[in-house]
Amino acid sequence: MFEGMSFIFDIDGTICPIKKKEESYEDLVPYPEMVEKIRAYKEGGARIIFFTSRNMNSYQGNIGMINANTAKIILAWLDKWKIPYDEIIYGKPWPGHHGFYVDDRTVRPDEFLRLSVEELDELCKKSRCD
C-alpha cells in the first residue's frame, strides 16, 4: 500500500515532546498517535527514516560525540517504545531557537497526523515556488 514511499521524521518535538531541563531523554514518552501512524505506514511498506539534530548544539556539531553518546540513547528509546524504522541519520544541522527549516517536501506533525498521503502530496505541491 505504501511501497516506494519514504517518511523522514525529526524526533524531538515530532515523535516525542522536547526534553525539559529536569527530564532525561530516556524518560520521554512518545506521542501515541504519532507512533501508531508510523507503525501503520511501516506495516504498509513505507520506509521510515529518523533525521535528528539531537545534541548538535550540546556537542557543537561534533558527530563523533553524538555517535558515541546520543545514538545509543536514541536506539534504546526507539526499541523500548517499539517504534519501527529503517534508518537513523544523526547530525541534522540545528537552526537554533530562532531559525527554520525550509523545504518543499515538509509537512508539520499535525498535518501528518490528520491528512492522507494524497492530501500531504497536494499540500507540498501547493507550497512550491515554481
Regions found by a protein language model. Give the residues of each.
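Catalytic phosphate/metal-binding cores of nucleic-acid and nucleotide-processing enzymes, i.e., regions
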Residues: M1-D130
